[in-house]
Design a protein with these regions (language model features):
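Short amphipathic alpha-helical interaction patches enriched in hydrophobic/aromatic residues
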Residues: 18-21, 43, 65-67, 85, ...
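Divalent metal-dependent phosphate-bond-processing catalytic cores, especially two-metal-ion Mg2+/Mn2+ enzymes
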Residues: 5, 20-49, 89, 110-204
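Short alpha-helical hairpin
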Residues: 1-18
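Membrane-interface starts of transmembrane alpha-helices
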Residues: 90-95
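His-Asp-centered metal-binding catalytic motifs of divalent-metal-dependent phosphohydrolases/nucleases
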Residues: 52-73, 77, 97-107
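Amphipathic, well-packed alpha-helical segments that form the structural scaffold of globular domains
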Residues: 11, 15, 37-40, 44, ...
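An active-site-proximal "capping" alpha-helix that borders the catalytic cofactor pocket
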Residues: 35-36, 73-87
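Short gly/ser-rich anion-binding loops that grip negatively charged ligand groups
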Residues: 25, 67-71, 87
Length: 204
C-alpha cells in the first residue's frame, strides 16, 4: 500500500471536516493517524511474530472514523472507505479493511466471532480517548460548549468520567491494552488533581 497517497485521501475526506460541533476541525483525521500508529504498537507487543496484517491495520486505523457523524458511523464508514479506496487497494485488502471498519465500534471482548485484528483496532481506538488526548478532548469540548471557567472540569472527572472508567476498561480485549489504559487513567487523574488545586489558587 502507498501510505503517502492513502494519507492524502484521508486528509481530503476528513482533514477539514467537523464531525461534531464540539470537536475541532480535522479531529477524525488526526485521531485516525494516531490510531494507525498505536494499533501497530499493540500488534507488535501482543502478537510480535505476526506482521501479516500490518498494512491492513494501518489503513483501517487511518480510515476507521471516516463515517463519523453519520450513524451508525462504523457501517457507514465501511461504505465510504470502500469507495475512497477502491483504486488503491486490491479486492482482498479492501474487504479486510472495510470489515475492520464496519465493526470497530462493536465491542464484545468475550465474543470470539471477531478476529484478533479487529480487536486490536478496537483497543487502539478506545485508548486514544484517554491520557493526553483525553485531557485535550475534555478541554476542547468545554470550550466549544461555552464553559468559561476551568473549575467546572474537576466536577466532570469526579462524576461522569469516573463512572465511565470501569465500563470502558471492560470493553478492552487484551491485558496489554488494559495496562496502557490504567496508566493513561492515572495520568489524567493526576493532571486533574493538579488542575483542581491551581484553579482554586493553590500550588501545593
Amino acid at each position: 500500500m502507498n501510505f503517502e497517497r492513502l494519507e492524502a485521501i484521508a486528509y481530503k475526506a476528513m482533514g477539514k471536516r467537523k464531525s461534531h460541533v464540539e470537536r475541532e476541525i480535522g479531529h477524525v483525521f488526526f485521531h485516525g493517524k494516531r490510531v494507525s500508529n498505536s494499533v501497530l504498537l499493540l500488534r507488535k507487543t501482543i502478537f510480535p511474530e505476526d506482521a501479516s496484517h500490518d498494512e491492513i491495520l494501518r489503513c483501517a486505523g487511518l480510515f476507521h472514523d471516516v463515517g463519523k457523524g453519520i450513524e451508525p458511523h462504523a457501517r457507514t464508514g465501511a461504505v465510504l472507505a470502500r469507495e475512497l479506496l477502491k483504486e488503491e487497494l486490491t479486492e482482498s485488502e479492501l474487504n479486510a479493511v472495510c470489515e475492520i471498519i464496519s465493526v470497530h465500534d462493536d465491542r464484545h471482548p468475550e465474543d470470539d466471532r471477531y478476529s484478533p485484528w479487529i480487536k486490536l483496532l478496537q483497543d487502539a481506538d478506545h485508548l486514544d480517548h484517554f491520557g493526553s488526548q483525553g485531557l485535550w478532548l475534555s478541554f476542547t469540548y468545554r470550550a466549544y460548549m461555552g464553559q468559561k471557567d476551568m473549575t467546572e472540569l474537576p466536577a466532570f472527572y469526579e462524576s461522569e468520567w469516573d463512572e465511565s472508567i470501569p465500563r470502558t476498561r471492560s470493553h478492552l480485549n487484551f491485558d496489554f491494552s488494559r495496562k496502557i489504559f490504567d496508566e493513561k487513567v492515572r495520568y489524567e487523574r493526576d493532571a486533574i488533581s493538579r488542575l483542581k488545586l491551581e484553579s482554586e489558587g493553590f500550588y501545593i
